[in-house]
Amino acid sequence: MRLSSQRSVADSFSSMPLETLGAGTDLNLQDGSRVALIGGGPAGAFFTYFLLKMAEEIDLELEVDIFEPRFFSRCGPSGCNHCGGIVSESLVQILATEGINLPSEVVQRGIESYVVHMDVGSVAIQSPAKESRIAALYRGNGPREGGDLQWDSFDAYLQGMAVEKGARVRHNLVTGVDWIDGKPRLTEADGTASTYDLVTVSAGVNSNFIKLLKDSPSGIEPPKTTRTYICEFKVGRDGIQEIMGNAMHVFLLSIPRLEFAAPIPKG
């Protein structure tokens, strides 16, 4: 979980010495330019989708590689992207205006309200539209012992949209970055090295790539974090409906070292 913002990636790279980029380096993408995304979660998938969509509109051909070692179609920890899995109403509306409607196989339950529990009492906050437009979902393909659940991964769905636009997913870990003739070069765990015209960092705070950037000319500092515990409990559809209903419960209690707790009903 990110706690405090640091110097942005854009600020960091804009302050890089010109000799690192190379004299006369053209920063405009051209036909055949190569773009790499470090991280294939929602940030990387959305960036890729809209980049290729805009490139298509101006008849610009790009080669885009998404580096993501995880397979979001897998159950359990190997497919989990370390998130409780909740999409806000505002994001659902923004996606809809772009023609992106999350299918029922991805949205497991529509959330109608938030219930906030504090030491002084509890209060329910209803959705302004009074509709179930807050989405509960799985970032991966669900719990390891989840059984035969017919749900699709949110991250895999978005990644699939990017692939349909022409991106290529490389399930490899990037272990090194340097500059060759003013362009970033990425080295993978198997030793493969590739040079790109643009590298976009869409990795999470747990990514080792963020630490690699600290020693690069960009000098990006990893953000401060706090520990987050994510787990799943099999309650059953009837049990969830009886105990929680279609509400996400948030606990803001005076317990040492606890920022908050938030059970999310799914299924």
Residue ranges of each PLM-predicted region?
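N-terminal FAD cofactor-binding segment of flavoenzymes
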Residues: 71-123
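Charged, glycine/proline-rich intrinsically disordered loops and linkers
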Residues: 84, 99, 123-145, 218-219, ...
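Glycine/serine-rich phosphate-binding loop and adjoining beta1-alpha1 elements at the start
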Residues: 1-19
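Beta1/beta-strand and adjacent pyrophosphate-binding region of the FAD-binding site
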Residues: 24-43, 65-67
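Conserved Rossmann-like nucleotide-cofactor binding loop
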Residues: 43, 72, 206
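Predominantly flavin-linked oxidoreductase catalytic cores and closely associated redox partners
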Residues: 50-53, 152, 157-267
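Glycine-rich FAD pyrophosphate-binding loop
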Residues: 52-81
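Short beta-strand to alpha-helix junction loop
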Residues: 83-89, 131-160, 208
